[in-house]
Amino acid sequence: MDAMEIERIADSLERYGDRFLRHVFTEGEVAYCRRKRDSASSFAARFAAKEAAMKALGTGFSRGVYWQGIEVVRHHGPPQLQFHGGALARFQALGATRSLLTLTHSRELSIAHVLLLRD
C-alpha cells in the first residue's frame, strides 16, 4: 500500500513538467492522465501504485526495478499493473502469476494497494 499527496504531484508537474513525467511515467500513462479533468489526481494514483508495487516486489529502486518498469494500464474494467524489465524479472522470481491493484482518491490523497498472487 502507498499513499501520495495530490498537491505534491501537482507541484512536481508545475515545477519539473515533462522532465518529471518522462522520468516516472510511461507514454501510455501520460496520455491517459492528460485526458482526465483532474490529471494530478490520476498521476498521483499511478505514482502511489508504482511505489506500492515496489514494496510488494521487495526491491524499492534496486535489482533493475525503475519507475517505468511498473506501468498502470486500463484497457477495459479496473486498472491493472504491467511489469517490464527488472520489475518483470523480480515478479517472476517471486513466483507471482498475477497482481491485483486498487486505486482510490480523496481530495488530498491518492491511495494504491497492490497484491502479488500465485495461482
Whereabouts are the PLM-identified features?
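Core catalytic alpha/beta fold that binds nucleotide/phospho-ligands
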Residues: 1-119
